[in-house]
Structure formats: structure tokens, C-alpha cells
Amino acid sequence: MIAKLKGLLDETGTDWAVIDVSGVGYLVHCSSKSLAALGEVGEACTVYTDLQVSENDMRLLGFAEASERDWFRLLTQVQGVGSKVALAILSALSTEEVQTACANGDAAMVARAQGVGPKLAGRIVNELKDKAGALPSAPGGAAMAANPAGGASADAVSALENLGFKPAIAARAVATAQGELGEGASESELIRVALKRAAG
């Protein structure tokens, strides 16, 4: 199963993006929030993915953060919530807002999403209320502890090497990016800035 893609943002549409990984273009369907977070066409990006397989279709769903993918998987466990509805919810609400709505039983907040009526919204918050505290709402905290700056830097160097940059150039560009962004910089931020420095 494809869990994550690292490459260049090749093309975008209203609810999808094409990620070029070593010359292979992967079509991923995304929420509007994830699409906005991926950056500009031609820039390096990282997409967390979930493969949905049905009798007549196979599609890759893409997320800018692992926490959004986790919430997508939780939402699609609720009866009546398919990938389209789950993406609509994650387009209308941040993961933090989804978590708050479920924890507080706030069906009205979930019903703000396109295609989600009061009955379905009520079912979502009722079924996910007990699970709301089990997932991180946004990157940071535990996620940062699990992926310290050193790990992010190493992954960023690897990503640049995969894009064709020599190891020395990739390492120098990432080190420069780290200096500019600070120790708390995420992998995607490091890749974005380092790519500009390496190409410059």
C-alpha cells in the first residue's frame, strides 16, 4: 500500500493534484485545505496517502498532514460517510475543529460541510465522540516529538537526492534551510526552502 509520496507538485485541479515522483505522476484526490497546503506547482511536496479500492474504482486520497489522513479513516468508518463526504468535511473544517465537534457532540459544526445533513452529522459526532481524544488534531506536540528536527532534516536531504540533487548539494541546501527556518521546521518546509536554495 502507498502510504506517502514525496516529489514535485505537477498539476492541480479543484479537488485533486498530480504528484511527480521520479517521473511517475500520481493522481491524488485531496481536501481543499490539503491542496492549499501543498504549495505551488513545481515545488517539492510530501503527501500522506490512503488507497481506496472498490469493485469498479481505485483511487488515491492525499493529505498534507498525517493527522488529516487519520481523521479521514475515522470518518469513513461511519455508516453513510464515503470518501467524498469525508473530504468535504475536511475541506470545511480543520482537524482540530472536527475533533472539537466530535468531543462536544456539536453536530451543527459538522453539518457545515457540503453534503452533510443534520442526521448524518449527528451520527458522526455520536460514533466518534469516544475516539476524538485518541488522535492528534494537528501537527505538533506528539507528532513533533516523534519526528524531531534531525529526522526531518534527514528526510529532506533524502527527498532532494531522489529529485536528482547530489548528496553534498542536498545536505548543504537543507542545512541552509534549517538555519533560516529554525529547529522546529517541518520536513515539508525544509524541502520547500532547500529546493529553492539547491536550484539557485
From Swiss-Prot:
Gene3D superfamilies tied to this protein: 5' to 3' exonuclease, C-terminal subdomain, DNA helicase RuvA subunit, C-terminal domain, Nucleic acid-binding proteins
Domain of life: Bacteria
Keywords: Cytoplasm, DNA damage, DNA recombination, DNA repair, DNA-binding
Signal peptide (from-to): none
Region span, Domain II: 65-143
Single biological process term from Gene Ontology: DNA repair
Region (Domain I): 1-64
Region (Domain III): 154-200
Record localization: Cytoplasm
Main location: cytoplasm
InterPro entries xref list: DNA_helicase_Holl-junc_RuvA_I (IPR013849), Hlx-hairpin-Hlx_DNA-bd_motif (IPR003583), NA-bd_OB-fold (IPR012340), RuvA (IPR000085), RuvA_2-like (IPR010994), RuvA_C (IPR011114), RuvA_C_sf (IPR036267)
One GO term describing the cellular component: Holliday junction helicase complex
A molecular function GO annotation: ATP binding
Flexible linker: region residues: 144-154
Domain notes: Has three domains with a flexible linker between the domains II and III and assumes an 'L' shape. Domain III is highly mobile and contacts RuvB.
Subunit structure, as described in the record: Homotetramer. Forms an RuvA(8)-RuvB(12)-Holliday junction (HJ) complex. HJ DNA is sandwiched between 2 RuvA tetramers; dsDNA enters through RuvA and exits via RuvB. An RuvB hexamer assembles on each DNA strand where it exits the tetramer. Each RuvB hexamer is contacted by two RuvA subunits (via domain III) on 2 adjacent RuvB subunits; this complex drives branch migration. In the full resolvosome a probable DNA-RuvA(4)-RuvB(12)-RuvC(2) complex forms which resolves the HJ.
Biological function: The RuvA-RuvB-RuvC complex processes Holliday junction (HJ) DNA during genetic recombination and DNA repair, while the RuvA-RuvB complex plays an important role in the rescue of blocked DNA replication forks via replication fork reversal (RFR). RuvA specifically binds to HJ cruciform DNA, conferring on it an open structure. The RuvB hexamer acts as an ATP-dependent pump, pulling dsDNA into and through the RuvAB complex. HJ branch migration allows RuvC to scan DNA until it finds its consensus sequence, where it cleaves and resolves the cruciform DNA.
Family statement: Belongs to the RuvA family.
Protein name: Holliday junction branch migration complex subunit RuvA
Organism from which the protein derives: Erythrobacter litoralis (strain HTCC2594)
Gene giving rise to this polypeptide: ruvA
